[in-house]
Amino acid sequence: MEIILIKPVRKLGKIGDILKVADGFGRNYLLPQKLAIRATEPNKELIVKQKHEFEAKDKQIREEVEKINALIKDQKLVFIRQTSDDGKLFGSVTNKEIADKLSENVSYNISHSNIILDKQIKSTGIYTVEIRLHAELNAIVMVIVARSESEAQDYLREQKTETSEDLAESA
């Protein structure tokens, strides 16, 4: 299937790119999400005319996202959970819970689909989580999962100590 991107798509292309993609990918993801349109002759002509509008709109969105990104960057989210004796959680910390807490902290609604977890968070510790608000912008947030508030503070102190040791070694 040949498509024209109307929004930037990570690892695929930018606005106005004409690409060949698998039929299922185009039909089930790109078209319903309004990330692309079919590459017919009338659409190709339309995109040539409207490419500047799409790029201006994307630039405006990107500027808003950069402001939000500045708020999100370096956030530390603490989750206090019950665990077994060996530190395993009863359940897990989900991307929805991370999105809700982050939205609460920055006073901006962040969707759970923007939270990228490498693996499920099922034990206590410190995790780095990627927040993808735009195809070209990512932020990293620190998630701390602990049994109590004092344990979370211990994790933070431990993290600061490791960071200062790393800086001393590199100097």
From Swiss-Prot:
Keywords carried by this UniProt record: Ribonucleoprotein, Ribosomal protein, RNA-binding, rRNA-binding
Domain of life assignment: Bacteria
Signal peptide span: none
Keyword Metal-binding annotated: no
GO cellular component, one term: ribonucleoprotein complex
GO molecular-function terms, A-Z: rRNA binding; structural constituent of ribosome
Record flagged with keyword Ribonucleoprotein: yes
GO terms for biological process, alphabetical: translation
Pfam families, sorted: Ribosomal_L9_C, Ribosomal_L9_N
Recorded family membership: Belongs to the bacterial ribosomal protein bL9 family.
The protein's role, per its UniProt record: Binds to the 23S rRNA.
HAMAP family with a match to the protein in the record: Ribosomal_bL9
Protein name: Large ribosomal subunit protein bL9
